[in-house]
Regions:
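Short structured motifs
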Residues: 108-109, 122-125, 227
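Alpha-helical transmembrane signal-anchor/signal-peptide segments
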Residues: 118-132
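Hydrophobic alpha-helical segments, principally membrane-spanning helices and signal/leader peptides
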Residues: 102, 107, 128, 282-283
């Protein structure tokens, strides 16, 4: 506990220092547009960084007093910034009102940044004539990147435990190439105690150069690791083929398509056929086969999402303004692809903005 407290204190001073430096930069700029923009956006970015760094400690209930003091300091810095930014002088007699509006906008954006750091459950529905019994519920976890959401009060686990799902699907980057495996292992072990669990690899797990070790551990706790394979599951009278392919990081195109073809051939077209993959951008490859459902991750929801548009700003391997980042996509061959925004927070180089971490939930009924 002492070591953990020391880490919290260090992070607190680092975040407060970064917050101060961003606002000091805004104060020293002379060009009105940049100065005004930073006066509003700097607190938002700082709040997002704050939540990314403190997320595990907030959920674990460690030193709430320190967090409250830090937030008070954050608000004080915002107030100081808005009072002193020279940009507002251009508004003449309306300068005071403009300052108040800017401060209100900064506070609102900061609160939104904090709100969007909490994980949510996104529910979808899908109808198929292959479902002959009661509806089937699947939960998808993607891109955890070994992040922590707390100990016993882990909201991710609590949400999953309360879903009454029939299976949990892990669509890659559950582990990270830089962080310890402990957080990911703790969550996976507790999920496996409740539900059948299926996994495919992600690019960061390959980058770690410990992919074989990770897969061996997953198998040892009862997770089905899919490498161009298919497992048949009987759920409430419905036969489901859960297929999966490895991330293509170190594969040739022929090897990648070979895994997809092998999974396709192992599955039964009379069953509900589901493909687990990490990469949503490989749509043209998926359209060569006839899977009913495809689950993917990797894009992190576009990392910085544009408010009210549902559009992401950037995703790996899709770059700026990516097409496949979140939600449902109907493919040309009739397949439906669902992309999870994932759960990564403190492990990402940039904080998530307007982009809640998510658990994807799909209810599949008959028609």
């Amino acid at each position: 506990m002492k070591g953990e407290q020391q880490r919290v204190n260090v992070v607190a001073w680092l975040i407060l220092g970064a917050d101060f430096l961003m606002m000091l930069t805004a104060l020293t700029l002379t060009l009105p547009p940049q100065s005004f923009a930073l006066s509003v956006l700097a607190p938002h970015v700082a709040a997002a960084v704050l939540m990314a760094a403190f997320g595990p400690y907030l959920f674990a209930g460690v030193d709430w007093l320190l967090v409250i003091v830090l937030l008070i300091g954050h608000l004080w810095l915002m107030h100081l910034l808005v009072r002193r930014v020279r940009t507002f002088e251009v508004f003449g007699r309306w300068a005071r009102l403009a300052r108040r509006l800017a401060l209100g906008a900064a506070v609102l954006l900061s609160l939104l940044a904090c709100y969007y750091e909490f994980p949510v459950k996104e529910h979808y529905e899908f109808a198929s004539s292959k479902v002959s019994g009661e509806p089937v519920r699947l939960a998808v976890i993607s891109d955890l990147h070994s992040c922590s959401y707390g100990g016993r009060a882990d909201p991710v686990l609590c949400d999953i435990a309360g879903l009454n799902a029939d299976a949990v699907l892990l669509t890659g980057d559950i582990f990270d190439d830089r962080l310890s495996d402990d957080n990911a292992q703790n969550l996976v072990k507790r999920i496996v105690d409740i539900y059948p669990c299926f996994y495919v690899s992600g690019n960061h797990e390959y980058w770690s150069e410990r992919i074989d070790e990770m897969k061996a551990w997953l198998r040892s706790v009862g997770v089905a690791v899919l490498e161009g394979e298919c497992v048949t599951l009987s759920v409430k009278g419905t036969r489901i083929d859960i297929c999966g392919v490895d991330d293509p990081t170190y594969m040739s195109d022929d090897q990648w398509l070979g895994q997809l073809k092998q999974a396709d051939e192992q599955s039964d077209s009379s069953h509900l056929r589901i493909l687990l993959t990490h990469r949503p951008e490989r749509v043209s490859d998926y359209e060569l086969f006839g899977f009913d459902l495809i689950f993917a991750g990797h894009a992190h929801g576009g990392q910085w999402r544009i408010p009210f548009t549902g559009r992401g700003g950037y995703a790996p391997d899709q770059y700026f303004f990516p097409r496949y980042v979140d939600g449902r996509y109907d493919l040309a061959n009739g397949s439906v692809m669902l992309v999870s925004r994932g759960l990564a927070r403190e492990s990402t180089p940039l904080p998530r903005l307007f982009n809640s971490p998510e658990i994807l939930v799909l209810d599949i009924g008959g028609r």
